[in-house]
Amino acid sequence: MVDLKKIKNFAVIGGGIMGSGIAQVALLSGYEKVSVIDLNNEILEKSRTLIQQRIEALESEEKCKEFFANNDILKNLDFKKKLASFESVGIMANNVDTKTIMDRLCTETDLSKGVKDADFVIEAVSEMMELKQTIFKQLGSYSPPWTILASNTSTMSITKIAQKSKRPDKVIGLHFHTFFPITGVLIEITPGEKTSNESLELGRKVAQKFPSLFGERFTVQLEKESPGLIANRLAITGSLYFNWLTNQAKNSGISREQLEAANFSSEAADLIGIDTIYYCAKYFEENVSPEFTPNERLTDLFYAGKFGRKVGEGFYKWNEDGPIKNLPPVEKKTTDFIAKVFDPEIYSAIQLNEACKLLEEGVVKSYELIDKAILKGTFMPGPFVVGKTKYKEWAEKLEKFAKISGKSYLKPCAMMKTGKFIDYK
């Protein structure tokens, strides 16, 4: 049995939006010290301000509603109930005030100083393998020998990240499936080839302790590595369909703005970060299939430094109130195109097929677990909910689509075509 009480000092590598969000839930979990480490002092100052604002927003129902006024889901939550629940707001449910919590936050530009007494470290930097390997090599030298070293990556191999750490048995993947950790539920835990069971179990207990405004965390421990884990693997593969649809629209004289106006929004991409999505697509391109090559628009935004909300511009321009869209009225030729070309069942079929591949590859053992992970991560039904009865029809559709689109990666796998997934309940 692992003892969570041994985790007293917590460190986060990276002071961006994601790192700040992780630090917030770590502080609310009640650790004695939480350190945010970044090379840039200005980023650390912004991180401290953001963390304090987000914690202050949980002090009362009034502040909560004001802070989340533009969030269509959170603005309708029963905050009185949430504010009284440790699972929702952590130690604030025990009347611990913001000042006391913020006094436990440390910021540091020197990695060696920031992790010298850390019991648990989470890395939340850009999705670049070389950068992560460099950080984990340093963590292996600077942190105590018992420290668990976690990466928030959803894309990259934990085995490769751990190679230079000098302690691959202590390295795990711990991925928040959200860009705002206090509002997410799903956390996916991933082993590397040499990760110990004790490290995985401790990581899982740490993950379950993180508060969420939606209540108790749902943690999934994968049996083995998979690019994208569960939720992002399905999402990234599904993006192949929307990339194809965008190209078809362009060839039909329909602008991206028209598609955006017709509810094919890129807002989530701006929130996640154009750079993050670009690096993920490149990793899939190099490690899964060349068909995941980043599309032209994403590539242009990446090289222009338009990384989304965090820099004020991506697919949209952003201000404090959100994206500035100024979209045109939807034209008839756009609605006609969508009615003729867009088939949501193809997207569902792609997700079902990729979920079946996860079972075939032994990444997870149960289709019900995949469905639950998708539900908890996206608040949408998982692929098997309808796929259990429509897999034959969807397999035929997907076979045809893979042929006309030239995307052979999307061909239905044997498990999807036969329905054998039903044996993996």
Task: Specify the residue positions occupied by each region the protein language model found.
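Rossmann-like NAD(P)-binding element
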Residues: 39-45, 57-149, 156-160
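A short helix->loop->beta-strand "cap" motif at the edges of active sites that frequently abuts
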Residues: 31, 143-147, 169
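NAD(P)+-binding Rossmann beta1-loop-alpha1 motif at the extreme N-terminus of oxidoreductases
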Residues: 1-81, 138, 142, 209
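NAD(P)-dependent Rossmann-like dehydrogenase/reductase catalytic/cofactor-binding core
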Residues: 2-8, 12, 30-31, 201, ...
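Rossmann-fold dinucleotide-binding core
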Residues: 125, 148-233
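Short, flexible turn/loop "capping" segments at secondary-structure junctions
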Residues: 27-28, 114, 179-184
